């Protein structure tokens, strides 16, 4: 169970770093705002689910 927690935490950290770069780039590109808005929304929701998942795994480790 500890290995699953560590892998999930690593994925969360890497995904967070990806969002730190991707969100400002998507905000600055005004060419297709509706598509960028959907990508940011889905990415944020996925991040929240990952945080909750890591929290649950942390509880059971």
Swiss-Prot record:
NCBIfam families: PS_II_psbZ
Main location: membrane
GO terms classed as biological process: photosynthesis; photosystem II stabilization
Gene3D superfamilies membership: Photosystem II PsbZ, reaction centre
Subunit composition and interactions: PSII is composed of 1 copy each of membrane proteins PsbA, PsbB, PsbC, PsbD, PsbE, PsbF, PsbH, PsbI, PsbJ, PsbK, PsbL, PsbM, PsbT, PsbX, PsbY, PsbZ, Psb30/Ycf12, peripheral proteins PsbO, CyanoQ (PsbQ), PsbU, PsbV and a large number of cofactors. It forms dimeric complexes.
Origin organism lineage: Bacteria, Bacillati, Cyanobacteriota, Cyanophyceae, Synechococcales
Function of the molecule: May control the interaction of photosystem II (PSII) cores with the light-harvesting antenna, regulates electron flow through the 2 photosystem reaction centers. PSII is a light-driven water plastoquinone oxidoreductase, using light energy to abstract electrons from H(2)O, generating a proton gradient subsequently used for ATP formation.
Gene: psbZ
Disulfide bond annotation, renumbered to this chain: none
Protein name: Photosystem II reaction center protein Z
Family: Belongs to the PsbZ family.
Source organism per UniProt: Synechococcus sp. (strain JA-3-3Ab)
Alphabetical UniProt keywords: Membrane, Photosynthesis, Photosystem II, Reaction center, Thylakoid, Transmembrane, Transmembrane helix
Its membrane topology: Multi-pass membrane protein
Domain of life, source organism: Bacteria
